[in-house]
């Protein structure tokens, strides 16, 4: 018994009538300009015919036209495909970029354009919004936390716009107005801010009365946000700006400032979303402040990872890496000048990192004078624009810029400790510059440790101090004279690290050994530190790199040994 041949797949015989957004959502479109659904969601409404006209290409772009600039195209024989003139329903990267580059009317430029599909309504219903709202403190407490956030965490990396956040904050008192976007704006801010070590008493009293610690509350908030954001990924819903902001804030406020080991996974995720899902890197200042500043904040965090933690940059090797801010990003001259100087420091620091790992010794020495000149000019501007002990907000910016400055200068010279004596013609001067930079960095951070702790930068400051002390100890072996009071600083750092870091797998013992080794190198004639643990046979420099999860070329850059 013969079976009937399978039915041929029916091809679309007419051009799609719905707009691109409605077709992607698989909902009915009323074909207006814009359609009612796009107008309601304040999204760009574009039809296939409009996109084709703008691109000035054939009736429908084919796969080959969009995937490659090659003139060679695949031809299908008529007997295989009898409908060779049928138009395929395909929209390639050119069409997507047309949507990205679409500009709104001038009266809409101040609002943040949305390039992503909103979450399914099943995740935006009242039940989900209510479950998120229940995690928020009362309005008065939330307001104090938000104000603290903009005075501390948002100063260095401006991820959020204060006016937008305040609008979401005001919706707390109006449940009918509180939305999914409001929740995903406020909750990451609150979760990050309540992790600060020096919270005001009114905030601490609220959490004590609620029977929960701020850290536990932060953990619960992050778990809920993860649950909902992962549901969106499962349903192939592209995250909107609130998801990108959440990832950036975690990358900066948690992984960067409060973790010793491991890759900054949230930074990796935010880069992925910002490049492959919602391509912020293609957006310029011409579209609007509130879109471009997210990419700028991401580039700053990437630069800080490279300079302060000496990790390879993800973005700065790319042509889209940007560290120069635009004036329209900021509401005041102080913030703009701060990020202008920070961008210059990070740009110089990243360039130093690249040179250390790509040039030979002789070529790198030829660039020392140029880097020194750049850093000196930046230091003059820092002293002129931000030294103001009477204003704590301005003074914190001053201290932070000086911390980045001295770290960049340490990074400029630290590679030379890996070379044997006699290789450098001016070894005494170079080692002296490194040792002096280390001492200046340590003195700055120790003297300003209180304000750094208040602003959430205690762990980063302690790590920079340990690194500088380690390098100063190596400089002493090469003839540099170190001050006599560094032993007390080493003991203080060890006590503070034990207080704020939870060690596991014997890391506390190994960490203490590294600090005792540093102290013994700085002051070889003094007795060992009290409560010393048994000595280990491990190489202290390798042990240091392992504790802080640095790569093996942290102390011995392979490119510098290739002479």
From Swiss-Prot:
GO cellular component terms, A-Z = cytosol; nucleus
DNA-binding positions = 19-45
Q: Bias category Polar residues: which stretches?
A: 64-75
Q: Where is this region: Disordered?
A: 56-78
Which CDD domains does the entry link to? fungal_TF_MHR (cd12148), GAL4 (cd00067)
InterPro entries documented for this protein: OAF3, Zn2-C6_fun-type_DNA-bd_sf, Zn2Cys6_DnaBD
Q: What's in the keyword line of the UniProt record?
A: DNA-binding, Metal-binding, Nucleus, Transcription, Transcription regulation, Zinc
**Where is this protein localized, as stated in its record?**
Nucleus
Could you cite one Gene Ontology molecular function of this protein? RNA polymerase II cis-regulatory region sequence-specific DNA binding
The cross-references to Gene3D superfamilies, in alphabetical order and at most eight, read: Zn(2)-C6 fungal-type DNA-binding domain
Cysteines paired by S-S bonds: none
SUPFAM superfamilies (UniProt xref): Zn2/Cys6 DNA-binding domain (SSF57701)
GO BP term, pick one? positive regulation of transcription by RNA polymerase II
Q: Which PANTHER family match?
A: OLEATE-ACTIVATED TRANSCRIPTION FACTOR 1-RELATED, TRANSCRIPTION FACTOR DOMAIN-CONTAINING PROTEIN
Return the protein name: Uncharacterized transcriptional regulatory protein C3H8.08c
